């Protein structure tokens, strides 16, 4: 049994694959299996990976390429990878990102030394090769995950494979990591954290204001809501949640945030209002919800969110340029 299985979804990532593959095959941890799950990518992504693999002959026997029978989306790809994984621990790496070459040795070493079910790390957000921010990836509780105070990304979370057996599969491809991570966290006995950034999330900005962008936003929104409603139902049916817990209320409101950049557009404002409307009566009285979040909530209802956001953004940029 390998120490670690790394699941790498592959779809239209040809320009980024060489960088990702090189950092994976260059890992200082020797005992790894690499599962490249090809979601019927129409480009040369897999060819690029195989070319890089020639530089690492010792890794050839550790690489598996599985091609999905049809383009199936991120959720199905991740679940296929989990089904194929043989490692003691499992982690995901998105093929347009990259990892520190010591990442998996550090995570696995801590997991073994402390008998952890889940071990997390911090990550760096990059754009055009420039670091934008460092994000803490630690996760201490499901409640804090649902409140949006801790991360649920699979790329910074190494999970004991036995926790992933029998999980309910996500039903859509946006927010699929939250469905998997929350279930794993509920089953975990012990968790730990490596307090340094080992993963590099490479942000590529997409417009959501033009026609194509709106279509993409609509699709992402519907997909997120499918998984959000599925997760809430799962928590209530299988894990004894009532639906009135502060973290569930805050999670419902958190789901609406995807619409905040376009909430000034009437159709999206209406969609925002109609999504989990029951939280509107509760969010202002929720102690776990920050004053800032309540402030923006009120401004959205007053239809002032967009102009105030633009003004505060201008002042922030102006102050940064003066410093």
Regions inferred by a protein language model and the residue ranges of each:
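Membrane-interface aromatic/basic loop that binds lipid-linked glycans or pyrophosphate carriers
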Residues: 263-323
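Conserved nucleotide-sugar donor-binding catalytic segment
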Residues: 141-223
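Flexible acidic/His/Gly-enriched loops in nucleotide-sugar-dependent glycosyltransferase catalytic domains
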Residues: 60-61, 103-171
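Acidic donor-binding segment of Leloir-type glycosyltransferases
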Residues: 21-67
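Glycine-rich, basic loop-to-helix element that forms the pyrophosphate-binding segment
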Residues: 65-85
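N-proximal low-complexity "stem/linker" segments adjacent to membrane-targeting elements
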Residues: 1-25
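Catalytic core of nucleotide-sugar-dependent glycosyltransferases
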Residues: 199-205, 211-243, 257-282
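Short aromatic/hydrophobic "clamp" motif used to bind/position activated sugar donors
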Residues: 90
